[in-house]
């Protein structure tokens, strides 16, 4: 009986939890809820490119093939890819990027959920992750094109739009 009283008194301290983590998660969610899936993927790719230039250098061809929807993201990606392909050293690239793209870099760091994932990963793991993100981006981009073509077909049915839609859908199914 005495033991029960002791546990009861002690339980009052256990109930007083720190809700700071929950609050931080809510704030992050509020910031990210306005971002589409494709924007989050863009930020994730840019985060890896910005923080792992060696990995980005190995993926120059794949990175130059994709075109981001957001102009500012596309400009940043192009600036980094161009600098890497010209053979500029990391310090020059970082200085150039940090001076011209401060606002977007801050936004990427605030909204990129990939930071925790890459924290303790090897360069090989990060390279694989970048491959997956690029593939996801291409799929999302194709889905967007399909949606837009379907909408176009609904508005006016023409053979060219229909054949392009079929081609895109079959390409998506193959991947």
Question: What does each model-found stretch correspond to?
Answer:
Residues 1-175:
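A charged alpha-helical hairpin associated with nucleic-acid processing machineries
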């Amino acid at each position: 009986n005495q033991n029960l009283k002791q546990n009861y008194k002690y339980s009052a301290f256990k109930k007083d939890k720190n809700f700071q983590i929950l609050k931080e998660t809510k704030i992050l969610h509020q910031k990210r809820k306005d971002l589409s899936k494709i924007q989050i993927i863009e930020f994730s790719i840019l985060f890896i490119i910005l923080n792992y230039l060696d990995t980005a250098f190995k993926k120059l061809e794949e990175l130059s093939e994709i075109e981001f929807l957001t102009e500012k993201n596309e400009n940043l990606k192009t600036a980094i890819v161009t600098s890497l392909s010209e053979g500029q050293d990391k310090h020059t690239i970082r200085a150039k990027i940090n001076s011209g793209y401060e606002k977007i870099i801050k936004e990427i760091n605030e909204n990129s959920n990939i930071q925790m994932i890459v924290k303790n990963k090897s360069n090989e793991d990060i390279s694989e992750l970048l491959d997956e993100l690029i593939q996801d981006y291409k799929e999302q981009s194709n889905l967007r094109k399909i949606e837009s073509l379907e909408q176009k077909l609904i508005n006016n049915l023409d053979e060219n739009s229909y054949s392009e839609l079929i081609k895109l859908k079959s390409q998506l199914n193959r991947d």
